[in-house]
Regions:
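Short, contiguous acidic and Ser/Thr-rich linear segments
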Residues: 22-34
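Short, structured protein-protein interaction patches enriched in aromatics and acidic/basic residues
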Residues: 55-64
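Eukaryote-biased recognition of intrinsically disordered, low-complexity regulatory segments
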Residues: 2-25
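Active-site phosphate-binding and catalytic loops of NTP-dependent enzymes
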Residues: 46-52
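Short strand-turn-strand beta-turns centered on an Asx-Gly dipeptide
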Residues: 66-70
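A generic structural motif
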Residues: 78-79
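Ferredoxin-type iron-sulfur electron-transfer modules in oxidoreductases and energy-metabolism complexes
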Residues: 31-46, 86-205
């Protein structure tokens, strides 16, 4: 049985277009399991459709976009989970480079501001800085973030203050290093977050 889907895709090239528009495409699926597979097939029909992609395995975070109103990764979104009509927009809250591609500069600026690396002035041992199993377990759920920006760009506080508010992804990474027993900058890291906008713009909405 044929499976035809309708795609409404956000189209905008700021160098050419006066305003964004939505364009409609129809695609009959032939084995495309994931949304990214369908996008690759659509690009064969219209080479001008622009989006990011790389690993296709949910590791790089390149293909994050807004899918039917929710941010997610195209490569991890199964076509069977989607309705017949699929609306694709760029991640909200960041400048659009073209179509589904956004400028991630502000997102990575906030990420870099939390110093996402171990800081330890103690001379390194011959092999490695050891952790107990319990200390290592403290980091579970913290280091897996792939920096796709799906969470930060779903956050209204990040939309309003992207140049000041660290955002969910940045705060997660900040805690990842604060919780790391090998890091010696805990107090400085906390001081770095002590600002009405950097941390305390986070609200339950």
């Amino acid at each position: 049985m044929s499976d035809t889907r309708i795609f409404e895709i956000y189209r905008y090239d700021p160098d050419v277009d006066k305003a964004p528009r939505m364009e409609t495409y129809e695609l009959e699926l032939h084995g495309e399991r994931m949304l990214l597979d369908a996008l690759i097939s659509l690009k064969k029909l219209d080479e001008s459709i622009s989006y990011r992609r790389s690993c296709r395995e949910g590791v790089c975070g390149s293909d994050a976009m807004n899918i039917n109103g929710k941010n997610g990764l195209a490569c991890l979104t199964n076509m069977r989970s989607l309705p017949k009509k699929i609306t694709l927009r760029p991640l909200p809250g960041l400048p659009v480079v073209r179509d589904l591609i956004v400028d991630m500069t502000l997102f990575f600026k906030q990420y870099l501001s939390i110093k996402p690396y171990l800081i330890n002035e103690t001379p390194p041992p011959e092999k490695e800085r050891l952790q107990s199993p319990a200390e290592r377990e403290e980091l579970d759920g913290l280091y897996e973030c792939i920096l796709c920006a799906s969470c930060s760009t779903a956050c209204p506080s990040f939309w309003w203050n992207p140049d000041k508010f660290v955002g969910p992804a940045g705060l997660l990474q900040a805690y990842r290093f604060i919780a790391d027993s090998r890091d010696e900058e805990t107090s400085q890291r906390l001081d770095n977050l002590e600002d009405p906008y950097r941390l305390f713009r986070c609200h339950t909405i």
